[in-house]
Amino acid sequence: MKVEYYAMKTPPDKKSTVGEIKERFDADVERFSNLATGQQAVIDAPLMLDLISELAVRIKPDARNLLDIGCGAGNNTIAIIRKRGGMNCDLADLSLPMLERARERLANEHTGEVRTFHGDFRELTLPSSNYDIIVAAAVLHHLRDDADWESCFGKIYGLLKPGGAFFVSDLVFHEDEGVQGEMWRRYGEYLESMGGPGYSGKVFDYIDKEDTPRSLTYQMDLMKKAGFRHTDVLHKNSCFAAFVGIK
């Protein structure tokens, strides 16, 4: 099925509230506990998960402290722990049921101390200069205006130890309308191939209602502005990307 370009209709100030986003994830724990179903709408989700977990332990082989922002059911933390066990893991999420499921799953893994932080990451009090690895997978697209984005990247930078690594995998948009239109069209065709006729419309509708993604270049510029000395693109395919900043 041919999928045409889909333009966002909902302005940022009319998007889902934090409470509404929390309710959606509270009700969907089982699906997000399974990578095959929870990440069906994400192009190359298994590849990005493997890349980030592999590079996390390669860049920081002696890492002791890990923070997973918007951890969901713990998929990224589990992938990293299985390649480098024994780390202390701090898990942060809006959804208490998600946090409980992540903690439950990590109980079966070789970890150090596991702590959970329930709430909006922007409002959580976390230890500064404490983390060797920070991961944010499919979460930053909920940030809204420029001040929100800049504040969040600055906070993450402050939480990392010198030499620490900040990994992101997420939905991204594009600065040029023509590029965005083509990438969005290709994403729609991918969705139809995965979920059948009409699936792209469902996904596009909740993106329009809930998400405010920014471009990969915008986010990497923010990393530099926050102070990260090295930044690298790990992977990009259509509207999804994985990238890293080193403090």
Which residue ranges define each predicted feature?
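Class I SAM-dependent methyltransferase SAM/SAH-binding core
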Residues: N65-E123
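C-terminal alpha-helical "lid/dimerization" subdomain adjacent to the S-adenosyl-L-methionine
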Residues: S169-A226
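A short acidic, Gly/Pro-enriched loop at the edge of an enzyme's catalytic core
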Residues: L126-I134
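A short beta-strand submotif of the Rossmann-like class I SAM-dependent methyltransferase core
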Residues: A136-L140, V168
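Conserved class I S-adenosyl-L-methionine
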Residues: K2-K60
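Core SAM-dependent methyltransferase catalytic element
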Residues: K224-K247
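A short glycine-rich, Lys/Arg-flanked "PGG" loop and its adjoining helix->strand segment in the class I
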Residues: E150-P162
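A short His-aromatic
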Residues: H141-D145
